[in-house]
Structure formats: structure tokens, C-alpha cells
A protein has these predicted regions:
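Electrostatic interaction modules used in gene-expression and signaling proteins
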Residues: 91-95, 99, 106, 144-340
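Short recognition helix of helix-turn-helix/winged-helix DNA-binding domains
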Residues: 1-79, 86, 99-101, 110-179
């Protein structure tokens, strides 16, 4: 099971996970009859507050290989349980709840389960709420938070800090974000709606934010050296860009026997758009898989007797990686034999 370094998660989903998930339901109102004496139909909103385990599991799904429709194929329940440090039974029970709240749908497959993150396509709609980037190492820290309300608050801080990005662009000195007591009461359970409890929940510190409660407001700022998902991904983009260009040069040297690609023949075959595509593939499949597939492609395209012109390096690399992953998947033991 491939886990991406960064996940794109809808801001509306983060908002609901840190608060309540709304599910709309049509009911008959027998106290309000129509002209024919029949009960009228009213739409009501049900509010569901997810558990820590359910929140973690839905976020985790975003780190798997999700296509543009929100579909993830052949996921091992055993591997999900291992990643979240829970039982397979918990994974299955969580899926039932997530499906009931219409956040996911799922079905069994020969290699495990197929999952659809229902609202995923809406993250990228022009008039939607947008998405934020979350790094997997940050997610690993979040799921270690024991108190579910502290987890909800930390997710809300991620959301607020990301939303404050535009404000910081105009005034870099304004790097502090805040959550007022009134805002806090909107997304937390009623039994936490007093300042002493808010103070206690906010005391949970992580590597990302330095948090201080002053009066009735939670103030927080990124710790020195810490980066949010958007900043970390930009840094990784630059690293991967350099790594891919170096890999192209090193592959030429190894296959040609020359000390360097002095004429730039090989590098000139790769346009900036090609490098950008390979960087994106590195986020999806990992830089080492991309470099391995790149080596095979360069060998076939430039150093074999039946070499052919490659017009789409990104598409070709993706195909090579998928073939290798498909081969590995075929060798796996069916999930039914390993799950309990």
C-alpha cells in the first residue's frame, strides 16, 4: 500500500471532522398535513460527531492513491489497521459509520476493499471551499494525540492557519493566528464550553504550533523551524526537481560510459513541463520509484537498438510504475486469507 507524503484534504471536511458531520434526511411531518391530508416532507439536518479513530481513518484514506473521482482500489484492511494501530474490526466498524454519514462508500474486492471518498471531487471545484495540504509526518503526530477534543482543536488550528495565508502575504509580521472562545464553542462539544476546559485542551502541544491561551482567546504560531503542509510541499518540490535532474545526468553517465552529458543532449530532451510532471509523480509514488522508472525509460529510449521517440515522459513513467505496482499486487496473498 503506497502512502503519499502529502494529502489534499477538503477544508470543508477538516471543518466537519473538527466539529460535526451534517447529514440531511427527509422525514414525514404528521403534524403538518397537505391539502389531501397527507403528511408533508421536511428536510432535517442530523449532526454526527466522529470519534478519534474515525477522524484518523478518514484522513488516512487521503494519503492513499486517490484518483480524481475519490476512488481508492484494493486497499488492505490489515494494512490500514497497522497504520492506525487498531484492529481490523475497528477499521470495519469505522467504515460503516463513515458510510452512514455519507463521507465514504466502500465495497469488497479480491485484494481488500475499494473506497470512494464521496466529497473528494468537490475539493477542486472552482466555487468550492478548496483544500489544504497535510504532510504524512504531521498526520502521524496527530493520531498520537490521545484526547479527541485536543485532536479536533489541532485540526482546526491547521485550518485557521492555512486560511490566514493571504493575510500573512500582505503583512508578514502578522504571523499569529487565533481562535476566540466563541469560535471554539462552535466546533467543540457542550461539556467543554468553559474556559478552564478550553485551557486544558489547548495545553496539548505538538511540534507544529506554539500555543498560548490569553483571556478567552487561543493564540498560536508556527514554532521555529516548523512548516505547515503548504510550505513543506514547496520545499520538497525544489528538492525533487533537483533530484530528478541529477538522476537524468547520472543515468546518462552510467549508460553511456561518458563522464558527463557535456553536450546536454539527454537533458535537452526533457522540457520543464516534463520535469514538473515527474515531480508530481514523485509525490504520488515516491521519488525512488520515479528514479527507477526514469532509468528504465532512458535506457529504452536512448540506448536500445529499437529506441523510440518519447513524447510524454510523465505519462510513460506513470505507465511503467503502474505496471510494476500491478505486478507486485498480483503476487500478494488475497486479503481474505490474512484478515481476521
Amino acid at each position: 500500500m503506497i502512502k503519499k507524503e502529502f494529502a489534499k484534504i477538503g477544508k470543508q471536511i477538516i471543518r466537519q471532522l473538527s466539529s460535526t458531520v451534517e447529514k440531511y434526511k427527509d422525514i414525514e411531518d404528521h403534524m403538518d398535513l397537505d391539502a389531501h391530508g397527507n403528511p408533508t416532507i421536511k428536510t432535517v439536518a442530523e449532526h454526527h460527531r466522529l470519534s478519534k479513530s474515525q477522524i484518523s481513518q478518514l484522513i488516512f484514506y487521503h494519503f492513499l492513491h486517490v484518483d480524481e473521482r475519490g476512488i481508492i482500489c484494493d486497499v488492505s484492511e490489515k494494512e490500514i489497521a497497522a497504520a492506525l494501530n487498531c484492529t481490523i474490526r475497528t477499521v470495519r466498524n469505522n467504515n460503516v459509520v463513515l458510510a452512514e454519514t455519507e463521507l465514504i462508500s466502500y465495497s469488497r474486492s479480491g485484494k481488500g476493499i475499494n473506497i470512494c471518498i464521496v466529497p473528494y471531487p468537490q475539493y477542486f471545484e472552482e466555487n468550492g471551499f478548496g483544500f489544504m495540504e497535510l504532510e504524512y509526518t504531521r498526520f502521524e503526530e496527530l493520531i498520537l494525540i490521545e484526547n479527541v477534543n485536543a485532536l479536533r482543536l489541532e485540526l482546526r488550528k491547521e485550518l485557521v492557519y492555512d486560511n490566514d495565508t493571504i493575510k500573512r502575504q500582505f503583512n508578514p509580521e502578522e504571523n499569529t493566528s487565533k481562535i476566540s472562545f466563541n469560535d471554539y464553542k462552535i466546533f467543540t462539544p457542550k461539556y467543554t464550553h468553559y474556559k478552564g476546559m478550553m485551557q486544558k485542551i489547548a495545553e496539548t502541544q505538538t511540534s507544529a504550533f506554539k500555543t498560548v491561551v490569553q483571556g478567552s482567546t487561543i493564540f498560536f504560531v508556527l514554532k521555529d523551524g516548523a512548516k505547515n503542509g503548504k510550505m513543506s510541499k514547496q520545499e520538497k518540490k525544489e528538492q525533487y526537481n533537483t533530484a530528478i535532474r541529477n538522476a537524468i545526468e547520472e543515468t546518462f553517465v552510467k549508460l553511456s560510459g561518458h563522464s558527463t552529458d557535456s553536450t546536454g543532449t539527454l537533458m535537452s530532451s526533457f522540457q520543464n513541463e516534463d520535469i514538473t510532471d515527474l515531480v508530481q509523480l514523485s509525490f504520488e509514488y515516491g521519488i525512488e520509484r520515479v528514479k527507477s522508472a526514469l532509468y528504465s525509460l532512458i535506457e529504452q529510449a536512448f540506448f536500445s537498438h529499437d529506441a523510440q521517440v518519447v513524447e510524454n515522459y510523465g505519462g510513460k513513467i506513470r505507465t511503467l510504475i503502474r505496471k510494476e505496482l500491478s505486478k507486485n499486487l498480483q503476487d500478494q496473498v488475497p486479503a481474505e486469507l490474512t484478515a481476521s
